[in-house]
């Protein structure tokens, strides 16, 4: 580290790095799950990809020595201030539970160390609070706070404002709920003055002192309850450092990062000074590859060794309360300001000039009509909710605020508690379905205002399509309670929004072409269920399709002339609204991917049996008349594989391709096997393998790898003794071929997990030696094994066990042998 990058020594310096961790919501609003996202490959979806690149690595970030050996594993969340979007946290809880738990643990440990936890809350689904109705703003805040309390087990002291968008009514709502402080961009301060009195001083981002907290008094609360605080404290992050971190190269070097962060420190000031920055948390690993490593080294080593205290905002506020007050900038129209719109909050309602780019000459005039259409829809749905909700709830809007408890826990006892507290006295369980439909209508009306829908370059972008899906779901639920054609009036307003892409057209066309076809009703669930059953009749009837519970009342399949005809009755129950439907289905499978499903609602069993007998008889006698008869008896509407959800659809086509795949791989393996000795001779002579044979070789050898591993997986201790596996490894190395089988890697990961479980169950020399031999073999294989969790486990084990082992090893030969093997094992894990 040279003199120019060395961080300043500072007994009064307090460093805070805030990470705003959030992802645009991506789930299908009807099934509450994220479907496959091809753009995220090789991962299933973007949440999974960014978890692998950012959220997970930050929970166990490595610091290394010069040769690249792991010195320490740091949970960055223990040392940074952070917020996670509630919708993202709900996904992590289910799909990345280890990472989720480390985030929760980090807050607990920081609270023990500093007296205040690192985590702060976030307004629920990242809507721009200044642009919401007061009632919606209130719900967004309440839901964000209740979600935080549910996860972290404590009250939040602060709340992250989406896009740091703020105005005074927003501050008033936050203060009313006990929020102590917020974090803003320095561009959002207008003027400052001492709390003790004095004249106001106009400030700009470059002149604002970001090393202290400010108090912001709220005019709306000045004449209110004298017992209630009429102010919120504000931290302004250092803008230039945040910009350099997000868009520059600061995360390449922990010393540069630390020096840049601490640059504002002034040793002449004899008071605690805050050196703080706030950025999107995804910078640490996703936007900036390996950014979590520099962050970890800066937090755990460079900053403390330079005399700075790594803390969080709440802890700093306790030792250095504000001595200055601030007035906030409110943007060009006085509606509020934000960190990502130079004009205030125009980016989420008009073509203000702020954009992510896109093609030359693109514009964002579509933002206004989209906002107007949503505001119109929101008002219509609010009227329905208020009028209809009065029949189910003591106070409909209070019930909406309390509904977050059900969103977080949909178990029967949670529903019973909710309705006992919020439902009208005597509300019967059979009325819960309508009540839940109203609440879900409101939930999606809130979700449709997610800021991402307006942030990006075009109306037809993925994020805007997502908020349109929320609107469609809210509409679908609202239509149960209204005879008015709400959708047509909404779509008429969307027609005023024009995409920059000529082929996409206007908002109405996008809605009709891209949104309406993906709307889900019970018939699509039936179609999905029966096609899944026909695809694999050996498995049991699926009991669930996503959150829908499926009870098969009866079903039968008849086959004739290569046509399968399935007929049956199902009872479906929504796991969200508890709505129940009894439906009869008739599905013809004409071979390959050609399915035709027709669904009849509330069909009497006698009528169902009669139809089934008639159709089965025609299939047996004149199969060519089956489809015309189905159309005659059941109508012209039908569903196909096109209407199946993405995961199952991919499985259907993969299964259909499998015989061709196996035949092709078999032929390739045969031809490669015939040429293998010649190709090995070429390699010995230093000659280049032809591209065709390289491709054939990787296909062939990866197939063989899977076959060998499948045989060895039940007895993993024999892996290192397998001559066939060793020969395969040597041949791949000689020929320069990559072993990249996903299936093979999966089996190797399971074997590694098996060794970890053995070592965890009994810390013995044999268990350590078996794992060492396995990892030593893996280092010879041209295949990448994911070692993150193995390293985490081993690091924790050694922290807890190795000191006592080392102390006993001088007296005990068995312990000494174990210690030696563990040292060798540590080396194979890159410690």
Predicted features and spans:
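Extended alpha-helical scaffold segments
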Residues: 678-831
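CE4/NodB-like, metal-dependent polysaccharide N-deacetylase domain
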Residues: 137-161, 224, 262-276
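Active-site and substrate-binding clefts of carbohydrate-active enzymes
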Residues: 3-64, 87, 200-534, 561, ...
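Beta-rich nucleic-acid/ligand-interaction surfaces
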Residues: 163-170, 189-193, 318-322
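Short, well-structured secondary-structure segments
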Residues: 14-19, 23-134, 139-140, 157-161, ...
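Acidic, His- and aromatic-enriched active-site or binding-groove loops in soluble protein domains
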Residues: 101-118, 142, 154, 175-224, ...
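Extended, Lys/Arg-enriched charged tracts that mediate electrostatic binding to polyanionic substrates
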Residues: 92-96, 187-189, 193-211, 216, ...
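Core alpha/beta catalytic barrel or barrel-like domain that forms the active/cofactor pocket
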Residues: 113-128, 151-160, 183-189, 232-241, ...
């Amino acid at each position: 580290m040279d003199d120019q990058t060395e961080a300043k020594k500072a007994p009064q310096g307090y460093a805070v790095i805030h990470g705003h961790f959030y992802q645009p919501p991506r789930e299908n609003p009807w099934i509450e799950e994220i479907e496959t996202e091809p753009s995220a490959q090789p991962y299933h979806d973007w949440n999974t990809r960014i978890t692998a690149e950012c959220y997970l690595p930050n929970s166990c970030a490595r610091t290394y020595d010069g040769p690249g050996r792991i010195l320490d594993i740091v949970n960055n969340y223990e040392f940074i201030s952070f917020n996670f979007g509630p919708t993202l946290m709900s996904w992590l809880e289910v799909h990345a539970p280890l990472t989720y738990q480390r985030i929760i643990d980090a807050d607990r440990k920081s609270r023990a160390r500093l007296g205040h936890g690192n985590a702060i809350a976030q307004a629920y689904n990242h809507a721009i609070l200044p642009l919401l109705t007061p009632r919606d703003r209130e719900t967004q805040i309440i839901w964000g706070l209740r979600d935080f309390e549910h996860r972290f087990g404590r009250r939040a002291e602060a709340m992250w404002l989406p896009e740091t968008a703020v105005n005074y009514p927003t501050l008033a709502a936050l203060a009313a709920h006990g929020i102590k402080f917020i974090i803003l961009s320095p561009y959002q301060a207008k003027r400052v003055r001492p709390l003790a009195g004095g004249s106001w001083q106009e400030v700009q981002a470059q002149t604002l002192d970001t090393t202290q907290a400010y108090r912001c008094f709220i005019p709306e609360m000045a004449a209110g309850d004298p017992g209630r605080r009429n102010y919120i404290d504000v931290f302004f992050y250092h803008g230039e450092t945040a910009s350099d971190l997000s868009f520059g190269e600061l995360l390449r070097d922990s010393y540069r990062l630390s020096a840049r962060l601490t640059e504002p420190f002034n040793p002449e000031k004899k008071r605690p000074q805050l050196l703080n920055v706030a950025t999107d948390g995804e910078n640490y690993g996703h936007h900036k590859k390996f950014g979590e490593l520099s962050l970890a080294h800066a937090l755990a080593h460079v900053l403390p060794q330079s005399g700075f205290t790594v803390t969080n905002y709440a802890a700093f506020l306790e030792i250095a309360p504000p001595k200055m007050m601030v007035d906030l900038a409110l943007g060009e129209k006085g509606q509020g300001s934000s960190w990502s719109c130079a004009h205030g909050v125009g980016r989420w309602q008009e073509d203000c000039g702020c954009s992510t780019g896109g093609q030359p000459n693109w514009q964002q005039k579509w933002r206004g009509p989209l906002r107007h259409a949503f505001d119109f829809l929101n008002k219509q749905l609010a009227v329905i909710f208020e009028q209809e909700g009065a029949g189910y709830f003591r106070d409909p809007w209070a019930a909406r605020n309390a509904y977050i408890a059900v969103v977080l826990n949909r178990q029967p006892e949670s529903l019973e508690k909710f309705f006992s507290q919020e439902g009208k006295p005597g509300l019967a369980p059979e009325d819960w379905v309508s009540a839940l439909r109203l609440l879900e209508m409101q939930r999606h009306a809130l979700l449709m205002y997610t800021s991402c829908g307006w942030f990006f370059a075009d109306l037809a972008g993925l994020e805007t399509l997502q908020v349109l899906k929320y609107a469609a779901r809210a509409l679908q639920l609202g239509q149960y309670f209204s005879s008015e054609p709400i959708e047509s009036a909404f779509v008429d307003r969307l027609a005023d929004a024009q995409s920059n892409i000529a082929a996409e057209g206007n908002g109405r066309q996008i809605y009709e072409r891209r949104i309406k076809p993906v709307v889900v009703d019970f018939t699509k669930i039936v179609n999905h269920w029966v096609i899944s059953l026909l695809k694999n009749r050996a498995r049991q009837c699926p009991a669930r399709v996503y959150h829908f519970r499926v009870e098969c009342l009866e079903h039968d399949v008849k086959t004739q002339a290569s046509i399968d005809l399935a007929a049956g009755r199902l009872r479906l129950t929504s796991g969200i609204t508890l709505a129940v439907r009894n439906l009869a289905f008739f599905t013809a499978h004409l071979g390959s991917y050609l399915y035709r499903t027709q669904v009849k609602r509330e069909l009497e069993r006698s009528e169902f049996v009669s139809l089934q007998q008639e159709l089965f008889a025609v299939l047996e006698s004149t199969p060519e008349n089956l489809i015309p008869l189905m159309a005659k008896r059941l109508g012209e509407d039908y569903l196909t594989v096109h209407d199946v959800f993405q995961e199952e659809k991919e499985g259907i086509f993969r299964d259909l391709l499998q015989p061709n795949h196996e035949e092709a791989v078999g032929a390739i393996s045969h031809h490669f096997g015939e040429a293998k000795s010649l190709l090995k001779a070429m390699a010995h002579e230093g000659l280049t393998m032809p591209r065709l044979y390289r491709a054939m070789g990787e296909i062939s050898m990866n197939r063989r790898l899977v076959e060998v591993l499948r045989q060895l997986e039940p007895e993993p201790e024999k892996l290192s003794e397998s001559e066939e596996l060793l020969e395969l490894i040597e041949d791949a190395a000689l020929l320069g071929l990559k072993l990249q089988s996903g299936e093979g890697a999966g089996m190797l990961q399971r074997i590694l997990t098996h060794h970890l479980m053995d070592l965890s169950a009994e810390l013995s020399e044999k268990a350590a030696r078996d794992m060492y031999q396995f990892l030593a073999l893996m280092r010879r294989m041209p295949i990448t094994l994911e070692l993150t969790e193995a390293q985490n486990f081993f690091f924790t084990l050694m922290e807890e066990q190795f000191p006592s082992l080392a102390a006993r090893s001088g007296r005990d030969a068995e312990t000494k042998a174990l210690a030696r093997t563990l040292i060798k094992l540590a080396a194979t894990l890159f410690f």
